[in-house]
Amino acid sequence: MSTAPAEWPNDAFHVFDTTLRDGAQREGISYSVADKLAVARLLDDYGVGFIEGGWPGAMPKDTEFFAQARSDLKLRNAQLVAFGATRHAGRKVHEDRQVLALLESEAPVVTLVAKSDVRHVERALRTSLEENLAMVGDTVAFLVGEGRRVFVDCEHFFDGYHHDPDYGVRLLMTAAEAGASVGVLRDTNGGMLPSGIARQVA
């Protein structure tokens, strides 16, 4: 498994591939650990910058993939990325098993999915808006403190922006202040047109 370079150029363009996680959710697709290792090697050969390997701790096959990758996957171009969630509401970050599993994967980069639509915070997470921000900030700071580069994946960002424009921005600022390198603005439902995205990010 490769390690992150000391500095990341501001003008660099990177391809972030999600075949091994998001792609594995397609109907009829079921990767074995050996399949995932083989695909990762091919993606590395293509020059992909980041390979999202799966969700360690949540999916046993993904946990095993990262364990085998430590010894069997020698990447020349790509960084392996572990996908996961922030700490649970009301739980200390250093005691949260799903966060610790991200560390145990030994992936140099972690993508954290975070609720950026207030309706999903209240209805799905069933917690307060402030606690959700704390969950993001605590988890990012903890992982960065352990030497990981962190991307924050803002789920339902554009739908949430229509409902409450300020909250998604507050979440991004919280993540950045805690040390996140990248904020991913996700059109989770796929309903945005390019012109609408351009207006919201301008």
Protein language model features and the residues they cover:
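A glycine-rich helix N-cap at a beta->alpha junction
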Residues: 75-83
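Conserved oxyanion/phosphate-binding beta-strand-loop segments in alpha/beta enzyme cores
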Residues: 1-11
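Alpha/beta enzyme core
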Residues: 10-15, 22-51, 58, 66-75, ...
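N-terminal start-of-chain detector that recognizes signal peptides
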Residues: 4, 53-54, 82-84
